């Protein structure tokens, strides 16, 4: 599972949570030529001290893309959160191809598609298309929703005693950020050919089940309240969210209702060598965070 450990392996966005986890996994698995790309190399001094080459790499700076990808054999492109991320990521793919990179892994999202109702997922679709058109080998890692996000969403639910959603009872296959980062590192170390992979937890979890987990772990009763998409949109806007951001969240719930988030695969175990952590175990492990 580490046949490419002696190739030059680049991780973009290496100063972020995902990037740091991916670099740490590459180090743990014996990679010998790791390049960590970041807009601010000074922020990765601790990583450089571990023998990792740190390069300035800014998706909005063509010059840094050229030097950042130079001499790289295989690269992990971690999707950005910028409003212009489609353009950013297309530029990164073009730079990788121009530099002679032979393989790209990319952190995408479930059922990436160009439809108007796809919300921010359309950005992932167009990046996937750019990667496919580049003629390189690739693994498109369609990461499902992070289990970590349920810690952030717990506060309002525990305060109000209600967990609102428009999923129509559809499940989500929550996967931890750590598991997805280990999976991405494993793909960088071992994947060949061209593949699209859903990266999931061990089983889908409905919002009703999530509410029950919150209740069990905190002793505070949380009840799931199902809404229509329009009701969810109105409620989010009333809570102060901008309309465009509320629409993204509603689109995400709509995808869960359609079953797009209920897929289960062995990708985590295949590329990391570990079984994915279940949401219940993750929340139990982080129970203290629910009390904050």
Where in the sequence are the language-model features?
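A hydrophobic C-terminal alpha-helical subdomain
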Residues: 230-292
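Short loop/helix-cap segments at secondary-structure boundaries that form the rim of catalytic
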Residues: 43-50, 67
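Structural recognition of the beta-strand scaffold that forms the well-ordered cores
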Residues: 76-77, 106
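Short glycine-/small-residue-rich Rossmann-like dinucleotide-binding loops
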Residues: 58-59, 79-80, 287
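Basic/polar N-terminal segments that are highly enriched at the extreme N-terminus
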Residues: 1-6, 288-292
